[in-house]
């Protein structure tokens, strides 16, 4: 499909699960915009600029992926970039209810904005940035969960 889609998140940090969703989306769609969100209600491990850079470096081999930092409403960002579809990763039942509510709210706010749910590959189903941060804060090894560039930035 020659369609522009958006995959949004805080990506603090980007994980191999995120990267799996980005890679698979890039095979399905003409252009994938990875929208790195500034979320004032969270205390990030990395600044917005650092997260954008880490995602860019993690995705550099994907020619149809663009990484952009943003703040504000995702529906407004989607309109600015002429995207009519959002990609959301869902790990399991715990994510589904929240993600459906979010998709319905986004559609209510933006009309034609659709959401496509992609589960991660089985080996990343349990993985989240929150878990990676917790392991890291307790001096655990996160090397198997994040791209190499993230691991280097954490050291």
Swiss-Prot record:
It comes from the Bacteria. The keyword Magnesium applies. This is Phosphopantetheine adenylyltransferase. The gene is coaD. It comes from Glaesserella parasuis serovar 5 (strain SH0165). One of its GO terms (biological process) is coenzyme A biosynthetic process. Homohexamer. Substrate binds at residues 10, 42, 74, 88. It catalyses: (R)-4'-phosphopantetheine + ATP + H(+) = 3'-dephospho-CoA + diphosphate. Reversibly transfers an adenylyl group from ATP to 4'-phosphopantetheine, yielding dephospho-CoA (dPCoA) and pyrophosphate. InterPro entries: Cyt_trans-like, PPAT, Rossmann-like_a/b/a_fold. GO terms for cellular component: cytoplasm. NCBIfam families: coaD_prev_kdtB, cyt_tran_rel. It is found in: Cytoplasm. Belongs to the bacterial CoaD family. Coiled coil: none annotated.
